[in-house]
């Protein structure tokens, strides 16, 4: 015991004090990191405001170390929307949809873009938007959304890198919608399955929905049919471009080949921002995703009931159930009781799609948003999406015979005839009172491009999913066919001045282009 006391007395505590003084900054920094990264999140796991504040603190603590710009890249500004008043974004808000190169810096959500906003009162302000990322794969280009508040009566918006400026075209977000429920349809390319469109359009109309359909390329006769439905108020057709860099550099990465699934997530985010202040509810479906309310007379009623039952949920997801489908050669032969009144389904659920209030969401991926906390996202078990994935041709040919589905008779999933008869009546009314019947005479009665594209997708990534890959339909061989022509989205493509670290590209004057042959 005496020996231990002697050792303690001989120990030089002054040296420890000096060392602590020298390292006190480092020690404090480590303690702060432990506090913000580990301790506070334990006590506030579900507090969104606290989590947002913590994220901001973490960013400012680590920005000097990790977030330097790494390399010169390109970005494409798809659309920019301005909201004088927004319930979710605030006043004088900007929402910008971009395709950006993830290699610009380590965390693209922390990218420091500078925007100069000017208005009609000769006021100007420099603002830095917040970024949200929506991507899953390892593609170089990722879907990004930039949000920031600017000035009243905005009339000019520019990107500024410290030396050069580039003006950004913008448009007003919609203030009214054709229906209270908007159904965003993912971009169609080499589209020919007109039967799916007719089914979706009439189902949506019956239950209070409106289709907003993006088109990259589509069979010309199918496009004529969709335009007739647009005149009748069933659908809004929108452009979705194959992106072109007007002035690319030697190091520029081609955007179409190196973006996830043709940047479908970008279209979902774009649709969200168009209707952010106009629709009560918004969904993000493919053309072959048909949703029919169960126990309710309309989409609005079912969605409202879900939110009343789960008041803390921001987004709902409905899973998919594949159903057996036989296409008809003529539009007059389509029968909704035959389409949806049977019981043949695959007895398993596929990754679903999202429904939400537009104000609850600021960005969107393909199947869900990665920016919604898991405890604020709910997978509904009260209903499902009818997935008309692989329709059989009118002559009985199965276009996807190499990937047969295991159908079973599931009596519990049968829809009542009373639900389907009014939809059939609506189709027959339209055929009698419009130009639809005449326009439909030239529609293809058998699929040609669908099995080609499906096979390409299957061989490229569905057959053998690869980790860290970039799933994309680019490179699919699309053989041309005599007498089959397409309508393509087109525009005047522009490039801004070379900037550091990002050069920006965009398009103006969107238009439909009729061409011989079809390409994706």
From Swiss-Prot:
GO CC annotation:
membrane
Return the protein name.
Glycosyltransferase family 92 protein C35A5.5
Enzyme Commission number(s) of this protein: 2.4.1.-
Q: Enumerate the Pfam families for this protein.
A: Glyco_transf_92
Annotated transmembrane regions:
25-45
Instruction: Tell me where it mainly resides.
Output: membrane
Residue ranges of every copy of the GT92 domain listed in the record: 181-463
């Amino acid at each position: 015991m005496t020996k231990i006391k002697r050792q303690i007395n001989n120990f030089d505590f002054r040296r420890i004090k000096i060392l602590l003084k020298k390292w006190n900054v480092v020690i404090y920094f480590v303690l702060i990191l432990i506090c913000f990264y580990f301790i506070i999140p334990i006590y506030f796991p579900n507090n969104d405001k606290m989590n947002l504040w913590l994220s901001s603190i973490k960013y400012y603590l680590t920005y000097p170390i990790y977030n330097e710009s790494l390399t010169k890249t390109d970005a494409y500004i798809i659309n920019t929307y301005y909201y004088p008043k927004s319930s979710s974004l605030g006043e004088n808000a900007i929402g910008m949809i971009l395709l950006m190169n993830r290699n610009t810096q380590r965390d693209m959500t922390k990218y420091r873009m500078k925007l100069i906003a000017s208005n009609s009162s000769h006021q100007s302000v420099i603002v830095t938007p917040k970024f949200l990322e929506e991507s899953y794969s390892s593609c170089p280009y990722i879907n990004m959304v930039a949000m920031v508040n600017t000035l009243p009566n905005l009339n000019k918006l520019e990107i500024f890198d410290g030396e050069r400026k580039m003006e950004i075209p913008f448009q007003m977000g919609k203030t009214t919608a054709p229906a209270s429920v908007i159904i965003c349809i993912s971009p169609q390319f080499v589209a020919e399955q007109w039967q799916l469109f007719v089914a979706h359009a009439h189902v949506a109309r019956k239950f209070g929905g409106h289709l907003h359909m993006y088109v990259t390329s589509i069979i010309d006769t199918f496009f004529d049919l969709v335009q007739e439905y647009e005149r009748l108020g069933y659908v809004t057709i929108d452009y979705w471009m194959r992106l072109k860099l007007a002035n690319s550099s030697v190091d520029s990465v081609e955007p179409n080949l190196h973006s996830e699934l043709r940047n479908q997530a970008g279209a979902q985010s774009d649709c969200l921002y168009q209707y952010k202040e106009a629709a009560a509810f918004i969904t993000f479906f493919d053309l072959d995703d048909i949703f029919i309310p169960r126990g309710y007379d309309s989409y609005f009623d079912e969605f409202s009931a879900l939110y009343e039952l789960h008041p803390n949920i921001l987004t709902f997801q409905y899973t998919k159930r594949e159903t057996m489908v036989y296409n008809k050669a003529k539009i007059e032969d389509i029968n909704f009781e035959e389409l949806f009144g049977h019981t043949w389904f695959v007895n398993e659920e596929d990754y679903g799609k999202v429904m939400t209030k537009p104000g609850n969401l600021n960005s969107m991926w393909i199947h869900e948003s990665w920016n919604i906390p898991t405890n604020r996202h709910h997978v509904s078990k009260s209903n499902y999406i009818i997935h008309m994935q692989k329709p059989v041709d009118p002559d009985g040919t199965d276009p996807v015979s190499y990937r047969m589905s295991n159908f079973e008779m599931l009596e519990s999933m049968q829809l009542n005839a009373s639900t389907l008869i009014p939809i059939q009546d609506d189709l027959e009314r339209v055929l009698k009172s419009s130009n639809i019947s005449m326009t439909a005479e030239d529609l293809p009665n058998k699929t040609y491009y669908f099995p080609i594209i499906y096979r390409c997708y299957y061989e490229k990534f569905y057959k053998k999913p690869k980790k860290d890959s970039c799933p994309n339909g680019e490179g699919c061989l699309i053989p041309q066919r005599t007498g089959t022509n397409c309508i393509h989205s087109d525009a005047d493509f522009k490039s801004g001045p070379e900037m550091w670290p990002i050069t920006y590209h965009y398009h103006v004057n969107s238009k439909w282009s009729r061409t011989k042959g079809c390409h994706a």
